[in-house]
């Protein structure tokens, strides 16, 4: 019988991974969602929804544009670091990472996606069901790397961060005619909640037990929505904010239902509405100055390719701003929001 030996370098990598896993209360952060948590997956698919160019990432370690729709790190990155894991969660499709990197954290999120498959179709990004397929593939690779028992423990003990939903309304329902012709806004919310339930049950069946499930923020206060608010120009669009409150209420009821029905599951509903409303309306309390416009360009409508390095109007200090581009928060805002939720997460999941 042939005897197989692990090379010292491979053995060292595995041992380092195991020590990291053993030393953390949560062994890994596993992320699903949209641009609020996409750490670069869209760099590796054919889509216009990318942020892998300057000035994106200018405050990221090394000043690299990683594909994060931010000047620096995302809330999921800060949560990973707060749990004693690595300071950034790598994108699953990034070939510069491998399963040893993903053993303590992995991101399947895709900027521009939503609960609704038709939302992903708008910009040709990864639909939520495909994120789940990548998760299955990841589980198989993790088992091959660490063995089934140890991999299953990581899957069971990891914290799952889910952040998605805004695009379904702003990119799809209120922009394109198809869903509006099929659903009233109340019916569409119910449709999305049904998809959310199927998704959460799917990852539960795949082993997920600890989840931070994020609602949607006051999307009427995004700079892009302020500038297009015809009823009250440059003010928060109240109808969109009211919708966010309504939708978050439906998501909260879903979380209550699943926590009651699914054995062993614990879902924390991370409702970002109140903290983001507080930051937007009272930025000075958080060491910020400007919330009505963004850092990039004019701060009113630029995001993605419109937020290019040649735009002379881009601010010099993003730490003064709530928003980085017309749709996404700055690194500083992401850190504030992450810190806010971590106070609850650290007591729930350990």
Swiss-Prot record:
Residues 1-24 form the signal peptide. One of its GO terms (biological process) is lipid catabolic process. CDD domains: SGNH_plant_lipase_like (cd01837). SUPFAM superfamilies: SGNH hydrolase. This is GDSL esterase/lipase At2g42990. It is found in: Secreted. Keywords: Glycoprotein, Hydrolase, Lipid degradation, Lipid metabolism, Secreted, Signal. Glycans are attached at residues 98, 117, 141. Its main location: secreted. One of its GO terms (cellular component) is extracellular region. It holds the Pfam family Lipase_GDSL. The active site is at residues 35, 325, 328. Gene3D superfamilies: SGNH hydrolase (3.40.50.1110). Disulfide bonds: none annotated. Belongs to the 'GDSL' lipolytic enzyme family. It is an enzyme of class 3 (hydrolase). Its EC number is 3.1.1.-. InterPro entries: GDSL, GDSL_lipolytic_enzyme, SGNH_hydro_sf, SGNH_plant_lipase-like. It comes from Arabidopsis thaliana. The keyword Transport does not apply.
């Amino acid at each position: 019988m042939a005897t197989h030996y692990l090379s010292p370098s491979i053995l060292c990598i595995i041992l380092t991974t195991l020590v990291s896993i053993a030393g953390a209360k949560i062994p890994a952060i596993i992320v699903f969602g949209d641009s609020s948590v996409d750490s670069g997956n869209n760099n590796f698919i054919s889509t216009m929804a990318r942020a892998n160019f300057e000035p994106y990432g200018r405050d990221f370690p090394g000043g690299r544009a990683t594909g994060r729709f931010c000047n620096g790190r995302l809330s999921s990155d800060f949560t990973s670091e707060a749990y004693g894991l690595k300071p950034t969660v790598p994108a699953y499709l990034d070939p510069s990472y491998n399963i040893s990197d993903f053993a303590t954290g992995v991101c399947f999120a895709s900027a521009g996606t939503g609960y609704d498959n038709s939302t992903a179709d708008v910009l040709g990004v990864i639909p939520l069901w495909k994120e789940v397929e990548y998760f299955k593939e990841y589980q198989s690779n993790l088992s091959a790397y660490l063995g089934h028992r140890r991999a299953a423990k990581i899957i069971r003990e990891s914290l799952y961060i889910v952040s998605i939903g805004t695009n379904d309304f702003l990119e799809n329902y209120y922009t394109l005619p198809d869903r509006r012709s099929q659903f009233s806004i109340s019916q569409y919310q119910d449709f999305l909640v049904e998809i959310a339930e199927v998704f959460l049950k799917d990852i539960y069946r795949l082993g997920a037990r600890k989840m931070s499930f994020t609602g949607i923020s006051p999307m009427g206060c995004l700079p892009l929505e302020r500038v297009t608010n015809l009823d009250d120009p440059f003010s928060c669009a109240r109808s969109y904010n009211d919708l966010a409150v309504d939708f978050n209420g439906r998501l909260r009821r879903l979380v209550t239902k699943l926590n009651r029905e699914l054995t062993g599951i614990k879902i924390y509903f991370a409702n970002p509405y109140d903290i983001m409303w507080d930051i937007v309306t009272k930025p000075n309390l958080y060491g910020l100055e400007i919330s009505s416009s963004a850092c990039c360009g004019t701060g009113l409508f630029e995001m993605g390719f419109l937020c290019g390095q040649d735009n002379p109007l881009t601010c010099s200090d993003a730490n003064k701003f709530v928003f980085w581009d017309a749709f996404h928060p700055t690194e500083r805002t992401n850190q504030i929001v992450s810190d806010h939720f971590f106070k609850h997460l650290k007591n729930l999941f350990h």
